[in-house]
UniProtKB/Swiss-Prot annotation:
Disulfide bonds join 25-40, 146-159, 169-193. One of its GO terms (cellular component) is extracellular region. PANTHER family: FI18310P1-RELATED, POLYSERASE-RELATED. It catalyses: Preferential cleavage: Tyr-|-Xaa, Trp-|-Xaa, Phe-|-Xaa, Leu-|-Xaa. It is an enzyme of class 3 (hydrolase). SMART domains: Tryp_SPc (SM00020). This is Chymotrypsin-2. Keywords: Disulfide bond, Hydrolase, Protease, Secreted, Serine protease. It comes from Vespa orientalis. InterPro entries: Peptidase_S1, Peptidase_S1_PA, Peptidase_S1_PA_chymotrypsin, Peptidase_S1A, Trypsin_dom, TRYPSIN_HIS, TRYPSIN_SER. Gene3D superfamilies: Trypsin-like serine proteases. The active site is at 39 (charge relay system), 82 (charge relay system), 173 (charge relay system).
């Protein structure tokens, strides 16, 4: 995240770091699954999921990936249907610092709404990965404005923007975009990084059926 601040311990108990063996993507958790971006899973086999800590160098609990589930309509050229699940080898044990994320029950998010993005992505292009989880408040951008910058945009995607110098960067992919404690987006792509163009997220609401079907 470019332009963010250090997240306090325990504020985002659903946020996880995917490692192979170093941090490469974010994700969010349910009892047995991690929700992330498809592009974080393609071509990877050894995944570990680290939960419960805002510091990368302080591992609270680590779970091994048992199965990687990529949405079969994921298109790596157009970057659509960029959603995936990791089934971990055992149930994630919940504590004060480890909690499942809530998923949306309706598609009520609209342009101008404030949303919170968290992640351990780079703090500028080719910059370092921060040790402390970063947080930033962004705004939802209307689809037309976003389409003018990302022509292939579909209704199953959603965009954010605030100003130049704020936004997602490499390593934030797969991480959660949250409105009022409900995850509405998954970090998908953007023009790297924070150069004044909207970030694009997979719209979680559009994939609720897929998520349910695949969390067996």
């Amino acid at each position: 995240i470019v332009g963010g601040t250090n997240a306090p311990r325990g504020k985002y108990p659903y946020q996880v770091s995917l490692r192979a063996p170093k941090h490469f993507c974010g994700g969010s958790i349910s009892k047995r699954y991690v929700l992330t971006a498809a592009h974080c899973l393609v071509g990877k086999s050894e995944h570990q999921v680290t939960v419960g800590s805002v510091l990368l160098n302080k591992e609270e609990a680590v779970y091994n990936a048992k199965e990687l589930i990529v949405n079969k309509n994921y298109n790596s050229i157009r970057l659509i249907n960029d959603i995936g699940l990791i089934r971990v080898s055992k149930d994630i044990s919940f504590t004060q610092l480890v909690q499942p994320v809530k998923l949306p029950v309706s598609n009520t998010i609209k342009a101008g709404d404030p949303v919170v993005l968290t992640g351990w992505g780079r703090i500028y292009v080719n910059g370092p990965i921060p040790n402390n989880l970063q947080q930033i408040t962004l705004s939802i951008v209307n689809q037309q404005t976003c389409k003018s910058k990302h022509w292939g945009l579909t209704d199953s995607q959603i965009c954010t923007f605030t100003k130049r110098g704020e936004g997602a960067c490499h390593g934030d992919s797969g991480g959660p975009l949250v409105a009022n404690g409900v995850q509405i987006g998954i970090v998908s792509y953007g023009h790297p990084c924070a150069i004044g163009s909207p970030n694009v997220f997979t719209r979680v609401y559009s994939f609720l059926d897929w998520i349910q079907k695949n969390q067996l």
